[in-house]
């Protein structure tokens, strides 16, 4: 029912930092925000994307929850000339495991969207929709057709899986699937 991005404070953090540092240097990123997507599969780690920007799709918000570092605040202060080394110190993480879960749905006219029931669950920090009631959701061909998202944290992977399922089912969504004539 969607894509997910999980962040855990796992032992391979140091190795990931070394990989990302090596990838940023050849593209000229030395200061400012930098974004990297990695695919970690067992002992294999590959770089998918490197960019001179903060990540989208709630990446910075998720990172703040599981690492304590507020990249949005730091980048805003840097852009305004007010960033100091103290601003680069991470705060206290909310939880060791988190996820951005994107919500997808079949195409059709959106009748009802309500995220409040999911937001009432402990560990759900944000829940929202990219589309509005009355709009027609097109078939899923890219990330632009995602219906919405959930931003969640938990104390472990199993708890996060359960919370994610519960939050997805708590979303009040009604879509009138339209048939082509």
Model-assigned labels for residue ranges:
Residues 2, 98, 145-149:
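Short, solvent-exposed beta-strand edge segments and adjacent coil->beta transition regions
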Residues 102-133:
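Glycine-rich active-site loop/lid that clamps phosphate-bearing ligands
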Residues 43-46:
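Conserved protein kinase catalytic/activation segment
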Residues 15-36, 51-111:
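Active-site "cap" helix and flanking loop/linker of ATP-utilizing ligase/carboxylase catalytic domains
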Residues 7-15:
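N-terminal low-complexity segments that are often proline-rich with Ser/Thr-Pro
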Residues 131-181:
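Generic C-terminus detector
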Residues 38-40:
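Conserved hydrophobic "DFG−1" position in protein kinase catalytic cores
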Residues 1-8, 59-62:
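Glycine-rich phosphate-binding loop of ATP-grasp-fold ATP-dependent ligases
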């Amino acid at each position: 029912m969607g894509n997910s991005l999980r962040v855990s404070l796992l032992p391979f953090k140091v190795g990931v930092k070394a990989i990302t540092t090596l990838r940023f240097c050849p593209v000229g990123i030395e200061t400012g925000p930098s974004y990297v997507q990695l695919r970690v599969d067992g002992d294999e780690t590959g770089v998918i994307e490197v960019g001179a920007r903060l990540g989208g799709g709630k990446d910075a918000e998720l990172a703040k929850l599981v690492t304590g570092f507020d990249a949005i605040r730091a980048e805003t202060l840097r852009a305004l000339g007010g960033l100091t080394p103290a601003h680069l110190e991470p705060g206290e993480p909310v939880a060791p495991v988190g996820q951005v879960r994107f919500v997808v749905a079949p195409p059709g006219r959106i009748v009802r969207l309500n995220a409040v029931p999911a937001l009432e669950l402990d560990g759900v920090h944000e829940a929202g929709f990219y589309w509005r009631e009355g709009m027609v959701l097109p078939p899923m061909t890219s990330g632009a057709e995602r219906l919405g998202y959930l931003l969640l944290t938990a104390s472990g992977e199993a708890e996060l899986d359960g919370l994610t399922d519960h939050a997805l089912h708590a979303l009040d969504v009604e879509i009138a699937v339209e048939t082509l004539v």
